[in-house]
Amino acid sequence: MAKLKLDIVTAERSVFSEEVDVVVAPGIEGEMAILPHHAPLMTALQAGELKAKIGTEEYSLVVSGGFLEVRPDRVVVLADSAERAEEIDIARAIEAKKRAEASMADKYVPGMLAAETEASLRRAMVRLKVAEKRRKHPQV
């Protein structure tokens, strides 16, 4: 069966590099599944869960922004930030969520700051979702 080489990198490090069967990524226009021999594509990513499947195993990562490049045999993710499920600091994510919710409760937050706060809240919520999923299903 054909495979895809998946490389997920940030400015600081390589987060994931494996041969996979399928990649499910959070594109800016919605979630997309990428299989081997996919047509070439370049798209921006939004904060969300990126899933990589190898056989019956599924790996979950959190990506926040960046770009995804698809070639027939390779997927490269250049993320603003990325972390594997097992790397998520749950206490830190809970605190980030609380801070973002408190900021959003302020009715006088300027437009640009409101957008940044909303993005922070989304990142925290995705991190908590992925961490909780891993806690319930340790193989993820």
UniProtKB/Swiss-Prot annotation:
Its membrane topology: Peripheral membrane protein
UniProt GO MF annotations: ATP binding; proton-transporting ATP synthase activity, rotational mechanism
Main location: membrane
InterPro entries: ATP_F1_dsu/esu_C_sf, ATP_synth_F1_dsu/esu, ATP_synth_F1_dsu/esu_N, ATP_synth_F1_esu_C, ATPsynth_dsu/esu_N
Entry keyword NADP: no
Pfam families: ATP-synt_DE, ATP-synt_DE_N
GO terms under cellular component: plasma membrane; proton-transporting ATP synthase complex
Subcellular location: Cell membrane
Keyword terms: ATP synthesis, Cell membrane, CF(1), Hydrogen ion transport, Ion transport, Membrane, Transport
Keyword Secreted appears in the UniProt entry: no
Primary role: Produces ATP from ADP in the presence of a proton gradient across the membrane.
Family: Belongs to the ATPase epsilon chain family.
PANTHER family documented for this protein: ATP SYNTHASE DELTA/EPSILON CHAIN, ATP SYNTHASE EPSILON CHAIN, CHLOROPLASTIC
Subunit (UniProt): F-type ATPases have 2 components, CF(1) - the catalytic core - and CF(0) - the membrane proton channel. CF(1) has five subunits: alpha(3), beta(3), gamma(1), delta(1), epsilon(1). CF(0) has three main subunits: a, b and c.
Protein name: ATP synthase epsilon chain
Organism: Dehalococcoides mccartyi (strain ATCC BAA-2100 / JCM 16839 / KCTC 5957 / BAV1)
Gene: atpC
